[in-house]
A protein has these predicted regions:
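Bacterial N-terminal signal peptides
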Residues: 26-39
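Short, solvent-exposed amphipathic alpha-helices that sit
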Residues: 61-76, 162-166, 192-211, 225, ...
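Flexible loop/hinge segments that line or gate small-molecule binding clefts
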Residues: 122-161, 181, 276-283, 287-288
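Hydrophobic alpha-helical
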Residues: 109-131, 201, 215, 219-281
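Hinge/cleft segment of the Venus flytrap/periplasmic-binding protein
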Residues: 185-189, 204, 301, 305-366
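Extracytoplasmic "Venus flytrap"
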Residues: 49-68, 72, 76, 80-99, ...
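Sec/Tat signal peptide C-region and signal peptidase I cleavage site
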Residues: 39-45
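Hydrophobic alpha-helical segments within soluble ligand-binding/sensing domains
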Residues: 92, 153-180, 226, 274-278, ...
């Protein structure tokens, strides 16, 4: 046994005190942040976040999602995060995962997948996290929402009917109705609405053999790409009588190309989505028709359903299949009603009844 000299005792005590003091300070540096994290975590847990994942804010139609979501977030007094994929599927999924991690899965989602194929990895991610969500527009036809407990619903508009309507209106503008040449612009080829709208166009063409589709390009829903593609196609086909496009952003790009070729107003254009510029183009005699899809309502309905499920006010598992994959009606727009539609939906915002999630239900998606 070692015996410390008496004179050494105070020095050893001081040493032990210094060690203990350092340990105590080290403990405090660990405990204080932990307490702060716990406190903020409990505070955060009391406030669910809302989140929307959309393609971009450079599209006037997509901006309506944001406007609607912001109005709903203000109404329910919850924070909102707006995520954009910028046409990058991996970015979309990564951002969704980051949002789940940031909120501790305390989030209700509305999602417009970048591509139909993206719906599955998104569903698996959010289902594993126990996070409720609603998707819009794109998913693979063979993927069923009810196979994922937290995937509340997939909602869309009738894309085939949209393609039929806009193509029919375009053909009416020909010098000889049902006789003429057209070019066309598709969106993203992997998107469900693009495929459906294209199918509608093909139906009309099959019923009107006197109309020839000379060329088409995929402009990826983008205005600039549509402008460039239209310019190129006009070089090869300067004698067309119409331009069919799968959305309004591409329609506006096509109109710009037609203006530069001195064909605007002579060659009509159709689109889909119902952005303000397209309404003005219809009024100005540059476009024949569009379809108004109410992006503000889309976002609010999706968030309201997700939040209700999270709060236990919507029992997802008890919903029939027809309420988990369904369509709601859009508004056909031409020169006859463009002023009224613009007044009702653009210059003003309707009061949406979100107490009945299926008030606008039109038909089930198989």
């Amino acid at each position: 046994m070692r015996i410390f000299p008496l004179l050494a005792v105070p020095a050893r005590a001081a040493f032990l005190f210094r060690v203990s003091e350092r340990a105590r300070l080290r403990m405090l540096t660990l405990v204080i942040p932990l307490l702060a994290f716990t406190a903020t975590g409990n505070l955060h847990a009391a406030s669910t976040s809302l989140a929307i994942s959309i393609r971009t804010l450079s599209s006037p139609y997509q901006v309506m999602y944001k406007v609607g979501a912001e109005a709903y977030a203000k109404q329910v007094g919850l924070p909102l995060d707006v995520l954009t994929t910028e046409a990058n599927s991996q970015k979309g999924l990564t951002d969704i995962k980051a949002e789940v991690a940031r909120t501790g899965a305390n989030v209700a989602f509305y999602i417009d997948p970048n591509d139909a194929a993206d719906a599955v990895p998104i569903a698996k991610t959010l289902d594993a996290a126990g996070t409720y969500f609603v998707t819009w527009w794109s998913k693979p036809a063979d993927v069923k929402v009810w196979d994922y407990p937290h995937w509340i619903a997939h909602i869309s508009f009738d894309g085939v009917a949209a393609g039929v309507y806009t193509a029919t209106e375009l053909l009416k503008t020909f010098k000889t109705p049902g006789q003429g040449k057209i070019i066309a612009l598709q969106g993203r080829l992997g998107d469900t609405p693009n495929a459906e709208r294209w199918q509608g166009l093909q139906q009309v063409l099959s019923q009107n053999p006197g109309v020839k589709l000379l060329q088409w390009e995929s402009a990826l829903w983008d205005r600039t790409k549509a402008y460039n593609s239209t310019k190129e196609m006009l070089v090869a086909h300067p004698d067309i009588e119409g331009v069919w496009t799968a959305n309004d952003d591409m329609a506006m790009g096509a109109i710009q190309a037609l203006k530069e070729a001195n064909l605007a107003g002579k060659v009509m254009v159709t689109g889909c989505d119902g952005i303000p510029e397209m309404f003005d183009a219809i009024k100005g005699g540059l476009a024949a028709a569009t379809i108004f899809n109410d992006g503000k309502y889309q976002a609010q309905l999706g968030l309201a359903m997700s939040l209700a499920a999270k709060q236990g006010k919507l029992d997802v598992k008890s919903l029939p299949h027809e309420h988990r994959q369904f369509e709601i009606p859009a508004v056909n727009v031409n020169r006859e009603n463009v002023d009224q539609v613009k007044h009702d939906y653009i210059e003003n915002t309707p009061t949406y009844d979100l107490s009945d999630f299926f008030a606008k239900w039109s038909k089930a998606i198989p």
